[in-house]
Amino acid sequence: MFGECHAHVIMDGKNYKAAVALHKERPNEAVIREHLSAWQQADITFVRDGGDAYGVSERARELAGEYGIDYRTPIFAIHKRGHYGGIVGLPYDDRQGYRELVQEARKRGADFIKIMISGIM
């Protein structure tokens, strides 16, 4: 058994902009299934996704059971507007905005809350 502990199903590791464009209108189920199938073939049974702003990781979690994968996601990361995190999350401006995003994540069934507090290391 193997696990992927820092995935972003919305990304492809080649071209971020092209990968995200595949999901702009709605999560692209065919692309998501390609990722899930590749993980299944690699005997990966646990995936911890970092979330995204388009609902892609949320849909992946819904489909993952078909592939024998335990899929966890925050649905989206939470970041302060104008700071690092826009590629995988939603912004807040003040404490009330932050509270609303946490409530939204809970409502959508987030497995954990991801808070962006630093940039790329």
Please state what every model-predicted region is.
Residues F2-E62, Y84:
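Metal-associated gating/positioning segment near the N- to mid-region
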Residues G65-M121:
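Metal-coordinating catalytic core of metallo-dependent amide/deamination hydrolases
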